[in-house]
Design a protein with these regions (language model features):
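N-terminal Rossmann NAD(P)H-binding glycine-rich loop of SDR-like oxidoreductase domains
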Residues: 2-27
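Amphipathic terminal alpha-helices
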Residues: 37, 289, 301-311, 315-333
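NAD(P)H-binding glycine-rich loop region in Rossmannoid oxidoreductase-like domains
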Residues: 62-106
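Glycine-rich NAD(P)-binding loop of the Rossmann-fold in SDR/ketoreductase-type enzymes
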Residues: 98, 102-113, 158, 162-163
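Conserved Rossmann-fold NAD(P)-dependent oxidoreductase catalytic core, especially the SDR/UDP-sugar
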Residues: 112-157
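Active-site Tyr-X1-5-Lys
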Residues: 141, 155-183
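NAD(P)-dependent short-chain dehydrogenase/reductase
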Residues: 172-227, 233-235
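Mid/C-terminal beta-alpha module of Rossmann-like enzyme folds, strongest
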Residues: 212, 235, 239, 243-294
Length: 333
Protein backbone atom coordinates (compact mmCIF):
# COMPACT_ATOMS: atom_id res chain seq x y z
CA UNK A 1 0.00 0.00 0.00
CA UNK A 2 1.24 3.49 -0.86
CA UNK A 3 0.78 6.57 1.30
CA UNK A 4 1.31 10.04 -0.15
CA UNK A 5 1.60 13.52 1.38
CA UNK A 6 1.05 16.66 -0.70
CA UNK A 7 2.07 19.99 0.84
CA UNK A 8 0.15 22.82 -0.75
CA UNK A 9 -2.50 20.18 -1.33
CA UNK A 10 -5.38 22.66 -1.56
CA UNK A 11 -3.68 24.69 -4.27
CA UNK A 12 -4.20 24.37 -8.00
CA UNK A 13 -1.38 21.92 -8.74
CA UNK A 14 -1.67 20.13 -5.39
CA UNK A 15 -5.38 19.42 -5.74
CA UNK A 16 -4.99 18.39 -9.38
CA UNK A 17 -2.17 16.03 -8.42
CA UNK A 18 -4.31 14.54 -5.64
CA UNK A 19 -7.20 13.93 -8.05
CA UNK A 20 -4.92 12.16 -10.51
CA UNK A 21 -3.47 9.96 -7.77
CA UNK A 22 -6.92 9.05 -6.48
CA UNK A 23 -8.25 8.36 -9.97
CA UNK A 24 -5.33 6.03 -10.68
CA UNK A 25 -5.83 4.23 -7.37
CA UNK A 26 -2.22 3.10 -7.28
CA UNK A 27 1.30 4.52 -7.41
CA UNK A 28 4.64 3.09 -8.41
CA UNK A 29 7.17 4.34 -5.88
CA UNK A 30 10.66 4.89 -7.30
CA UNK A 31 10.46 2.01 -9.75
CA UNK A 32 9.43 -0.57 -7.16
CA UNK A 33 6.19 -1.59 -8.86
CA UNK A 34 2.65 -0.26 -8.53
CA UNK A 35 1.07 -0.31 -5.09
CA UNK A 36 -2.58 0.32 -4.21
CA UNK A 37 -3.09 3.83 -2.89
CA UNK A 38 -4.02 3.75 0.77
CA UNK A 39 -4.02 7.40 1.77
CA UNK A 40 -3.36 10.89 0.43
CA UNK A 41 -2.69 13.54 3.07
CA UNK A 42 -3.20 17.15 1.99
CA UNK A 43 -1.43 19.83 4.04
CA UNK A 44 -2.37 23.45 3.40
CA UNK A 45 -3.47 26.60 5.18
CA UNK A 46 -6.49 26.78 2.87
CA UNK A 47 -9.40 24.33 3.01
CA UNK A 48 -9.21 21.38 0.66
CA UNK A 49 -11.66 21.27 -2.26
CA UNK A 50 -14.92 19.61 -1.26
CA UNK A 51 -14.54 16.63 -3.58
CA UNK A 52 -11.16 15.75 -2.10
CA UNK A 53 -12.22 16.30 1.50
CA UNK A 54 -15.15 13.92 0.93
CA UNK A 55 -12.93 11.07 -0.31
CA UNK A 56 -12.41 8.44 2.40
CA UNK A 57 -8.80 7.99 1.27
CA UNK A 58 -7.96 11.65 1.91
CA UNK A 59 -6.73 13.14 5.19
CA UNK A 60 -6.74 16.94 5.39
CA UNK A 61 -4.38 18.81 7.72
CA UNK A 62 -4.86 22.58 7.86
CA UNK A 63 -2.22 24.97 9.11
CA UNK A 64 1.13 26.59 8.48
CA UNK A 65 3.55 23.92 7.25
CA UNK A 66 6.50 25.13 9.30
CA UNK A 67 4.43 25.20 12.47
CA UNK A 68 2.82 21.83 11.79
CA UNK A 69 6.22 20.21 11.37
CA UNK A 70 7.69 21.80 14.48
CA UNK A 71 9.14 19.01 16.62
CA UNK A 72 7.31 20.38 19.65
CA UNK A 73 3.97 20.00 17.89
CA UNK A 74 3.07 17.32 15.35
CA UNK A 75 6.63 17.04 14.05
CA UNK A 76 7.13 14.03 11.83
CA UNK A 77 3.75 12.63 12.90
CA UNK A 78 2.15 14.71 10.14
CA UNK A 79 4.20 12.68 7.66
CA UNK A 80 3.96 9.31 9.41
CA UNK A 81 3.84 6.36 7.04
CA UNK A 82 4.44 8.45 3.92
CA UNK A 83 6.17 6.69 1.04
CA UNK A 84 6.16 9.79 -1.18
CA UNK A 85 6.00 13.45 -0.18
CA UNK A 86 5.26 16.04 -2.87
CA UNK A 87 6.46 19.40 -1.56
CA UNK A 88 4.48 21.99 -3.52
CA UNK A 89 3.70 24.52 -0.76
CA UNK A 90 5.35 27.88 -1.49
CA UNK A 91 5.00 31.62 -1.52
CA UNK A 92 5.09 32.73 -5.16
CA UNK A 93 7.52 35.07 -6.88
CA UNK A 94 5.61 38.33 -6.58
CA UNK A 95 4.86 37.70 -2.91
CA UNK A 96 8.52 37.00 -2.18
CA UNK A 97 9.65 40.24 -3.82
CA UNK A 98 7.05 42.23 -1.90
CA UNK A 99 7.62 40.49 1.46
CA UNK A 100 11.13 39.13 1.92
CA UNK A 101 10.39 37.59 5.32
CA UNK A 102 7.34 35.74 3.97
CA UNK A 103 9.52 34.12 1.34
CA UNK A 104 12.06 33.03 3.94
CA UNK A 105 9.35 31.50 6.13
CA UNK A 106 7.35 29.79 3.42
CA UNK A 107 10.06 28.73 0.99
CA UNK A 108 13.15 28.23 3.12
CA UNK A 109 12.30 27.54 6.75
CA UNK A 110 9.26 25.40 5.96
CA UNK A 111 11.38 23.38 3.53
CA UNK A 112 14.05 22.94 6.20
CA UNK A 113 11.38 21.72 8.63
CA UNK A 114 9.97 19.32 6.06
CA UNK A 115 13.34 17.78 5.28
CA UNK A 116 14.19 17.44 8.97
CA UNK A 117 10.85 15.72 9.58
CA UNK A 118 11.47 13.35 6.66
CA UNK A 119 14.84 12.49 8.17
CA UNK A 120 13.21 11.83 11.54
CA UNK A 121 10.88 9.29 9.94
CA UNK A 122 13.86 7.01 9.38
CA UNK A 123 12.16 5.38 6.38
CA UNK A 124 14.04 7.02 3.46
CA UNK A 125 10.89 8.36 1.74
CA UNK A 126 10.82 9.77 -1.79
CA UNK A 127 10.57 13.57 -1.63
CA UNK A 128 9.53 15.34 -4.83
CA UNK A 129 10.46 19.01 -4.58
CA UNK A 130 8.74 21.52 -6.81
CA UNK A 131 11.49 23.89 -7.91
CA UNK A 132 11.33 26.48 -10.66
CA UNK A 133 12.93 27.79 -13.83
CA UNK A 134 13.37 30.97 -11.74
CA UNK A 135 16.56 29.45 -10.27
CA UNK A 136 18.15 30.59 -13.54
CA UNK A 137 18.82 34.23 -14.19
CA UNK A 138 20.86 36.59 -16.27
CA UNK A 139 23.00 39.43 -14.96
CA UNK A 140 25.55 41.74 -16.60
CA UNK A 141 28.37 39.67 -15.11
CA UNK A 142 26.80 36.32 -15.99
CA UNK A 143 24.37 36.65 -18.92
CA UNK A 144 22.03 33.81 -19.75
CA UNK A 145 23.15 31.38 -22.44
CA UNK A 146 21.00 30.99 -25.54
CA UNK A 147 19.30 28.08 -23.76
CA UNK A 148 19.72 26.82 -20.21
CA UNK A 149 20.10 23.09 -19.62
CA UNK A 150 20.39 20.68 -16.71
CA UNK A 151 24.05 21.60 -16.25
CA UNK A 152 23.64 25.40 -16.40
CA UNK A 153 24.73 26.99 -13.13
CA UNK A 154 21.73 28.67 -11.49
CA UNK A 155 22.13 32.41 -10.98
CA UNK A 156 18.78 33.50 -9.51
CA UNK A 157 17.89 37.17 -9.72
CA UNK A 158 14.83 37.06 -7.44
CA UNK A 159 14.23 36.08 -3.83
CA UNK A 160 11.90 33.31 -4.98
CA UNK A 161 14.50 31.83 -7.32
CA UNK A 162 17.17 32.03 -4.62
CA UNK A 163 14.96 30.25 -2.09
CA UNK A 164 14.09 27.52 -4.58
CA UNK A 165 17.77 26.95 -5.41
CA UNK A 166 18.67 26.69 -1.72
CA UNK A 167 15.87 24.13 -1.37
CA UNK A 168 17.35 22.11 -4.24
CA UNK A 169 20.75 22.04 -2.55
CA UNK A 170 19.34 21.06 0.84
CA UNK A 171 17.36 18.25 -0.78
CA UNK A 172 20.48 17.02 -2.57
CA UNK A 173 22.48 16.96 0.65
CA UNK A 174 19.77 15.09 2.58
CA UNK A 175 19.78 12.62 -0.30
CA UNK A 176 23.57 12.30 -0.22
CA UNK A 177 23.39 11.50 3.49
CA UNK A 178 20.81 8.79 2.89
CA UNK A 179 18.03 10.44 4.90
CA UNK A 180 15.61 10.47 1.95
CA UNK A 181 15.46 10.10 -1.82
CA UNK A 182 15.15 13.60 -3.21
CA UNK A 183 13.79 14.42 -6.65
CA UNK A 184 13.87 18.14 -7.51
CA UNK A 185 12.02 19.10 -10.68
CA UNK A 186 12.12 22.61 -12.10
CA UNK A 187 8.67 23.58 -13.29
CA UNK A 188 8.26 26.01 -16.15
CA UNK A 189 5.63 28.75 -15.99
CA UNK A 190 2.35 26.84 -15.89
CA UNK A 191 -0.26 28.14 -18.31
CA UNK A 192 -3.19 28.15 -18.50
CA UNK A 193 -4.06 28.12 -14.80
CA UNK A 194 -7.81 28.23 -14.10
CA UNK A 195 -9.50 30.21 -11.36
CA UNK A 196 -8.49 33.46 -9.73
CA UNK A 197 -5.14 35.17 -10.41
CA UNK A 198 -2.39 34.62 -7.86
CA UNK A 199 0.52 36.86 -6.86
CA UNK A 200 3.10 35.21 -9.10
CA UNK A 201 4.94 37.66 -11.34
CA UNK A 202 4.25 35.25 -14.20
CA UNK A 203 0.53 35.08 -13.44
CA UNK A 204 -0.35 37.26 -16.43
CA UNK A 205 0.76 34.41 -18.72
CA UNK A 206 -2.41 32.65 -17.66
CA UNK A 207 -4.45 35.81 -17.26
CA UNK A 208 -4.03 36.99 -20.86
CA UNK A 209 -5.68 33.74 -21.97
CA UNK A 210 -8.08 32.94 -19.13
CA UNK A 211 -9.66 36.37 -18.74
CA UNK A 212 -10.35 37.06 -22.44
CA UNK A 213 -11.90 33.60 -22.78
CA UNK A 214 -14.25 34.66 -19.97
CA UNK A 215 -15.07 37.93 -21.76
CA UNK A 216 -12.86 40.04 -19.49
CA UNK A 217 -10.00 42.37 -20.37
CA UNK A 218 -6.48 41.38 -19.33
CA UNK A 219 -3.25 43.35 -19.07
CA UNK A 220 0.02 42.08 -20.52
CA UNK A 221 2.86 43.91 -18.73
CA UNK A 222 5.71 42.79 -21.02
CA UNK A 223 6.44 43.37 -24.68
CA UNK A 224 4.98 41.04 -27.32
CA UNK A 225 8.49 39.91 -28.31
CA UNK A 226 9.21 38.50 -24.82
CA UNK A 227 10.08 34.80 -24.93
CA UNK A 228 8.69 32.56 -22.18
CA UNK A 229 9.13 28.90 -21.23
CA UNK A 230 5.73 27.29 -20.64
CA UNK A 231 4.18 24.01 -19.58
CA UNK A 232 0.51 23.10 -19.44
CA UNK A 233 -0.97 21.94 -16.13
CA UNK A 234 -1.09 18.40 -17.50
CA UNK A 235 2.61 18.43 -18.37
CA UNK A 236 3.51 19.86 -14.96
CA UNK A 237 1.60 17.09 -13.18
CA UNK A 238 3.14 14.51 -15.47
CA UNK A 239 6.59 15.72 -14.48
CA UNK A 240 5.82 15.55 -10.77
CA UNK A 241 4.45 12.02 -11.07
CA UNK A 242 7.45 10.91 -13.12
CA UNK A 243 9.76 12.20 -10.39
CA UNK A 244 7.97 9.99 -7.87
CA UNK A 245 7.79 6.86 -9.99
CA UNK A 246 11.22 6.79 -11.68
CA UNK A 247 13.77 4.37 -10.29
CA UNK A 248 16.91 5.76 -8.68
CA UNK A 249 18.91 4.57 -11.68
CA UNK A 250 16.58 6.22 -14.19
CA UNK A 251 16.46 9.48 -12.22
CA UNK A 252 20.22 9.66 -12.47
CA UNK A 253 21.67 11.80 -9.71
CA UNK A 254 20.89 14.32 -7.01
CA UNK A 255 20.70 17.51 -9.08
CA UNK A 256 17.44 19.02 -10.29
CA UNK A 257 15.76 18.12 -13.58
CA UNK A 258 14.38 20.77 -15.93
CA UNK A 259 10.80 20.04 -16.98
CA UNK A 260 10.40 20.22 -20.78
CA UNK A 261 9.32 23.66 -21.98
CA UNK A 262 7.31 25.03 -24.86
CA UNK A 263 9.05 28.27 -25.87
CA UNK A 264 6.68 30.98 -27.05
CA UNK A 265 6.71 34.72 -27.49
CA UNK A 266 3.86 36.49 -25.76
CA UNK A 267 2.74 37.63 -29.21
CA UNK A 268 2.64 33.97 -30.22
CA UNK A 269 0.41 33.22 -27.25
CA UNK A 270 -1.97 36.00 -28.32
CA UNK A 271 -1.96 34.68 -31.88
CA UNK A 272 -2.84 31.20 -30.63
CA UNK A 273 -5.72 32.69 -28.64
CA UNK A 274 -6.97 34.39 -31.81
CA UNK A 275 -6.80 31.15 -33.78
CA UNK A 276 -8.65 29.17 -31.13
CA UNK A 277 -11.21 31.73 -29.93
CA UNK A 278 -11.33 34.47 -32.55
CA UNK A 279 -10.02 38.04 -32.96
CA UNK A 280 -12.72 39.52 -30.74
CA UNK A 281 -11.31 37.51 -27.83
CA UNK A 282 -7.62 38.25 -28.41
CA UNK A 283 -8.53 41.94 -28.74
CA UNK A 284 -9.32 41.90 -25.01
CA UNK A 285 -5.58 41.84 -24.23
CA UNK A 286 -4.29 45.30 -23.25
CA UNK A 287 -0.55 45.77 -23.78
CA UNK A 288 0.44 48.00 -20.85
CA UNK A 289 4.17 47.81 -20.03
CA UNK A 290 5.20 47.41 -16.39
CA UNK A 291 8.95 48.09 -16.13
CA UNK A 292 9.32 46.12 -12.88
CA UNK A 293 7.75 42.97 -14.34
CA UNK A 294 9.64 43.41 -17.61
CA UNK A 295 12.95 43.67 -15.73
CA UNK A 296 12.20 40.46 -13.83
CA UNK A 297 11.28 38.60 -17.00
CA UNK A 298 14.44 39.80 -18.72
CA UNK A 299 16.43 37.76 -16.18
CA UNK A 300 14.47 34.51 -16.76
CA UNK A 301 15.28 32.05 -19.54
CA UNK A 302 12.88 31.67 -22.44
CA UNK A 303 14.63 28.63 -23.89
CA UNK A 304 15.26 25.49 -21.85
CA UNK A 305 16.88 22.19 -22.77
CA UNK A 306 15.61 19.19 -20.82
CA UNK A 307 17.79 16.25 -21.77
CA UNK A 308 17.37 14.36 -18.50
CA UNK A 309 13.60 14.79 -18.62
CA UNK A 310 13.57 13.56 -22.21
CA UNK A 311 15.45 10.48 -21.06
CA UNK A 312 12.63 9.86 -18.59
CA UNK A 313 10.07 10.04 -21.40
CA UNK A 314 8.81 13.56 -20.65
CA UNK A 315 7.93 15.83 -23.57
CA UNK A 316 6.86 19.48 -23.94
CA UNK A 317 3.43 20.55 -25.10
CA UNK A 318 3.31 20.35 -28.92
CA UNK A 319 1.90 23.87 -29.38
CA UNK A 320 0.01 26.54 -27.47
CA UNK A 321 -3.20 26.12 -29.46
CA UNK A 322 -3.62 22.68 -27.91
CA UNK A 323 -2.92 24.09 -24.44
CA UNK A 324 -5.74 26.63 -24.85
CA UNK A 325 -8.06 23.94 -26.20
CA UNK A 326 -7.25 21.76 -23.20
CA UNK A 327 -8.01 24.66 -20.85
CA UNK A 328 -11.37 25.25 -22.52
CA UNK A 329 -12.31 21.58 -22.25
CA UNK A 330 -11.39 21.44 -18.57
CA UNK A 331 -13.18 24.71 -17.78
CA UNK A 332 -16.56 23.62 -19.08
CA UNK A 333 -19.11 22.89 -16.32
Amino acid sequence: MAQVVVTGGAGFLGSRLARELLAAGSLEVAGSGARPLRRVTLIDQAPAPADLAADARVTVIRGDLGELLDAGRAGPDALAGADVIFHLAAAVSGECEADFDLGLRANLRATESLLASCRALGTNPVVVYSSSVAVFGGSPEHPLPAAVDDQTLPNPQTSYGTQKFIGEQLLADYTRKGFLRGRAIRLMTVSVRPGRPNAAASGFLSGIIREPLAGQRAICPVGPETEVALASPAKAIGGLLCAATASDEAWGGRTAVNLPALTMTVAGMAAALERVAGPEVSALIDWVPDPAVARMFATWPGRVRSDRAAGLGLTPDPDFDSVITMHLAESRP
